[in-house]
Design a protein with these regions (language model features):
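Beta-propeller fold detector
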Residues: 29-33, 68-72, 121-125, 163-173, ...
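Beta-rich, blade/repeat-based domains predominating
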Residues: 1-8, 34-53, 58, 75-92, ...
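A short loop-to-beta-strand structural motif that recurs across blades of beta-propeller domains
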Residues: 18-20, 58-60, 109-112, 151-153, ...
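Short, solvent-exposed loop/turn segments at conserved positions within beta-propeller repeat blades
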Residues: 14-15, 54-55, 98-109, 147-150, ...
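Flexible "stalk/tail and boundary" regions
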Residues: 23-24, 29, 45, 61-66, ...
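Short loop/turn segments immediately following beta-strands, especially the blade-tip
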Residues: 155-162, 286-291
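Blade-level signature of beta-propeller repeat domains, shared across WD40, Kelch, NHL, RCC1
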Residues: 251-294
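Residue position within the beta-strands of beta-propeller blades
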Residues: 11-12, 51-52, 92-96, 143-145, ...
Length: 294
């Protein structure tokens, strides 16, 4: 989950188990080590850093160079936790994989809400791998990527932080494919105990990390098609930029908020990612500046 904060890009390196920063001169700095793999990042109003710890399903808090537990999510989901968005009040929404073996055993799963004090509860159910998430500047709408469903889904956010009025915001995967072919292929892979390679089940774009801009567009990193795509509500595509490797996440930042940072790698399969160490961060200038959260 890359984030632009204090004039630096903050990002999680899963397999070096570290939260890192990158400044505009190209300098990389290690901030803190998270033994059980860091993922989504966000900040409380007082400036404390929240970090999703994937494997043990916790949110850790980094404050004054010390790491402590903010919230334990392990009783709410059996699956690895992943991306997170934190709003201006310090309320966090955290997604999870919805499967133990990627696309082989997909199950609808939940989105978890964590209040600023660390109290956690289920905010929404029956999501297909809730992943990258954004909140509009007024704090009233959430847009979340459902990776396995190939769509962006929106919710209204109430004053009590409850989610309602669920809608499909943009569809990337045809309904016929989502309902039939994808699950048939996943079943075959599971029965034959085959390793699912990225892109082998879904030839369409899917949302991994996402970010919001001032033109009410959402930039989507799509690992299956190795690109970043800008969508507007209804599924209209305004921009499409190919990446040399698989695109896993994106964030707008820079001095004017118009630099699009794109996190890429050749694979997210742990053994391959750890041995090859080929992750890269690309940048490009875009028309609209960053908006909302994160």
């Amino acid at each position: 989950g890359p984030r632009w904060h204090n004039n630096k890009l903050w990002f999680s390196d899963f397999y070096q188990h570290s939260v890192m920063t990158l400044d505009l001169s190209g300098k990389i700095e290690k901030i803190v080590e998270i033994p059980n793999q860091p993922s989504g990042l966000g900040w409380l109003p007082n400036g404390d850093l929240l970090i999703v710890s994937m494997l043990d399903r916790k949110i850790m808090k980094y404050s004054n160079n010390e790491l402590s537990l903010h919230s334990d999510l392990s009783k709410l989901t059996p699956f690895r936790c992943n991306d997170m968005v934190v709003d201006k009040d310090g309320d966090a929404y955290v997604g999870n994989f919805g499967s133990l073996h990627h696309a082989r055993d997909v199950k609808p799963t939940c989105l978890i809400h964590v209040d600023p004090q660390g109290n956690a509860k289920v905010a929404a159910k029956k999501l297909d791998f809730p992943n990258g998430t954004v909140i509009t500047p007024d704090g009233k709408k959430m847009i979340i990527g459902e990776t396995y469903a190939g769509r962006l889904t929106s919710f209204d956010i109430g004053l009590d932080k409850r989610l309602s009025n669920r809608k499909v915001w943009a569809k990337m995967m045809p309904t016929w494919y989502y309902i039939g072919v994808r699950f048939a292929l996943a079943t075959i892979y599971k029965l034959l105990n085959l390793q699912v390679k990225e892109g082998s089940i879904t030839p369409f774009p899917v949302p991994d990390g996402i970010c919001l801009d001032e033109g009410n567009g959402v930039w989507v990193a799509s690992p299956t098609t190795s690109e970043v795509i800008r969508f507007e509500e209804g599924g209209v595509i305004t921009d499409r930029l190919a990446t040399p490797d698989r695109a896993y996440a994106c964030m707008l930042g820079g001095h004017d908020g118009k630099t699009l940072f794109v996190i890429t790698g050749k694979s997210s399969i742990p053994e391959e990612a750890q041995s090859e160490k080929n992750g890269k961060i690309y940048t490009t200038l875009v028309k609209f500046a960053r908006a909302g959260y994160p």
